[in-house]
């Protein structure tokens, strides 16, 4: 989990929606699998890989460096876009950044099937 701050409280829904369009793409079938979610816990906000969410629910999952790297790269991109600020304490632990995910533009959203492998609250 990467602790973040929102620039404005209303940015929560923007970040949540944007994350639905970031992940692993199957270009042939035009399906995008969401990699990360925004989590609010005890008044703090986090960018969390879906496998971390499964693990918090007590499920056995294999999460590797590439998963963490993808999460960290997505968080960095959200920060570059001005949607979030990564907490300094979290910044120290970021994995090397990479471009191992796809971002679907808002305009392209209706052309793709967006799938989440985890649903918060279920």
From Swiss-Prot:
The feature table lists the DNA-binding region at 15-37
Outcome of substituting residue 37 to Y: 100% activity loss
Matching InterPro entries: Transl_repress_RegA, Transl_repress_RegA_sf
Query: Which BP terms does GO give this entry?
Result: regulation of translation
GO molecular function annotations of the record = DNA binding; RNA binding
Q: What is this protein called?
A: Translation repressor protein
User: Which species does this protein come from?
Assistant: Escherichia phage RB69 (Bacteriophage RB69)
Alphabetized UniProt keyword annotations: DNA-binding, Repressor, Translation regulation
Biological function? Controls the translation of a number of proteins (such as regA itself, rIIB and at least 35 others) by binding to their mRNA.
Short name of any one Pfam family annotated for the protein: Translat_reg
């Amino acid at each position: 989990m990467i602790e973040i701050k929102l620039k404005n409280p209303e940015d929560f829904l923007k970040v949540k929606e944007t994350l639905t369009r970031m992940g692993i793409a199957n270009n042939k079938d035009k399906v995008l699998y969401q990699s990360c979610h925004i989590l609010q816990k005890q008044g703090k906000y986090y960018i969390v890989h879906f496998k971390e969410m499964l693990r918090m629910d007590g499920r056995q999952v294999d999460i590797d460096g590439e998963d963490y790297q993808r999460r960290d790269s997505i968080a960095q991109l959200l920060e570059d876009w001005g949607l979030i600020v990564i907490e300094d304490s979290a910044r120290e632990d970021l994995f090397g950044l990479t471009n191992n995910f796809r971002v679907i533009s808002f305009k392209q959203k209706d052309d793709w099937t967006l799938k989440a492998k985890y649903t918060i609250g279920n």
